[in-house]
Regions:
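Short, Lys/Arg-enriched, Gly/Pro-containing loop segments at transmembrane-helix junctions
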Residues: 235-237
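Alpha-helical transmembrane segments
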Residues: 219-233
């Protein structure tokens, strides 16, 4: 992206023995490097029961996350099945690189995919999401996430109790805020609390109610009957 442009890379762990050379080249140009690993928690307080790869992490306070800070909600992210990243040494004074999501110090990882089997195993406070902005390339922006599963219905369905609602909305809101930041729109776009609204019809009396009930039942039956008659005529023609 030499002439500007923005990109989000969601790099879920992949056990295939291959290197993402093109993606790594893009990330390195923005001062970010990627680990070929899969992060997990050693402290049972930081993951759901029997799901050590579903990690409770911290959303860091940056200029990008200021809208989330203002909500007063805990700056906590839920990252399932994630790899980690780390800053790369790049000689570019116009480049700004920040961490977005960082694990607790009790996190560690295992080598997962890639061709560097002798690589040092990352552990401790690991970066699960980072972002960068390069003024020398028309303020081109890049965000990297160690997991794409955070946006799937399957992940939400796999959780129970308080785990299902406490951390996921803030993680998804972080994604929305990043998209808004890249599009130079309002970074206050985020999920609000769900509210149920019930529509109703006011019926003056029982006689009118019975009449409406007959209409509601008979009209669909009549339409279905007409459809069957037309179908039979076409079939026998």
């Amino acid at each position: 992206m030499l002439n500007g442009g923005n990109m989000i890379l969601m790099m879920s762990p992949n056990e295939a023995k291959l290197d993402y050379l093109n993606f790594e080249k893009i990330m390195h140009g923005y001062g970010i490097s990627m680990d070929y690993n899969k992060v997990f928690e050693t402290d049972e307080n930081n993951h759901p029961p029997d799901q050590k790869y579903f990690i409770i992490s911290d959303i860091l306070e940056t200029e990008l996350t200021s809208a989330l800070v203002e909500t007063g909600s805990p700056m906590i992210a839920f990252m399932p099945d994630s790899r980690s990243f780390y800053p790369a040494l790049v000689n570019n004074e116009k480049l700004k690189v920040e961490s977005l999501i960082k694990t607790k110090s009790t996190a560690t990882s295992e080598i997962f995919g890639g061709t560097h089997l002798d690589a040092k195993i990352p552990q401790g406070n690991l970066d699960l999401a980072m972002y960068a902005e390069d003024e020398s390339r028309k303020n081109s922006k890049l965000m990297v996430l160690g997991s794409a599963d955070m946006l799937t219905d399957e992940i939400l369905a796999s959780l129970t109790g308080d785990w299902q609602t406490s951390e996921m909305p803030m993680t998804i809101n972080l994604f929305f805020v990043t998209v808004s930041w890249m599009d130079l729109t309002d970074t206050n776009i985020m999920l609000s609390n769900k509210m149920t609204q019930v529509d109703y019809i006011s019926i003056p009396n029982k006689k009118t109610g019975d009449f409406l009930l007959v209409i509601m039942i008979s009209v669909p039956i009549l339409i279905s009957a007409v459809g069957v008659i037309v179908w039979l005529r076409r079939r026998n023609s």
